[in-house]
């Protein structure tokens, strides 16, 4: 979101000649069984400690919601800590529980996954076949976030991100994106053949163990 081309999606409040509060909304197209609609993702928000409790963050957030209404984006999504729920609830957001199960994995858990016959390689941004394979795998998912080629390239080359590819007869059949960043720690996303994904999980845990 922090890109000059995205300025229209950022809202700020200035006081004493400086920016003291900021809330962006990032539009993302969601694909569900062929149907498409746009959601607005709220993140990351912040207000300078010396200027909090003055309504600045709320003003920014509500202007983002105004933009969503004018753009016909029917749903807004955000991930936050429980302590901030009242702030968002005040502007119409509701807390929801997880819609799926999560399983924490430790490096030693690699033993529960089969390695299989797949060759595993690191994603190479300079190899167009790698990018094409990941795009084809992701775009075949019935439930997904739609991305442009440039957005794929950006995601896969973010700092502290590692992308693993499982190859079968020279073709990419699964991928796994793993992050070491403190704000997005762990597995970001993956897709493809189930057996190949299992091999990628095993390899990612072995890499963490090393």
Question: What is each stretch, according to the model?
Answer:
Residues 51-63, 195-204:
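Conserved acetyl-CoA pyrophosphate-binding loop and the N-cap/start of the following alpha-helix
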Residues 61, 66-80, 208-210:
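Conserved GNAT acetyl-CoA-binding A-motif
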Residues 94-195, 200-203:
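Amide-forming acyltransferase catalytic core, primarily the GNAT-like/NAT-type
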Residues 29, 200, 207-208:
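OB-fold and OB-like single-stranded nucleic-acid-recognition modules
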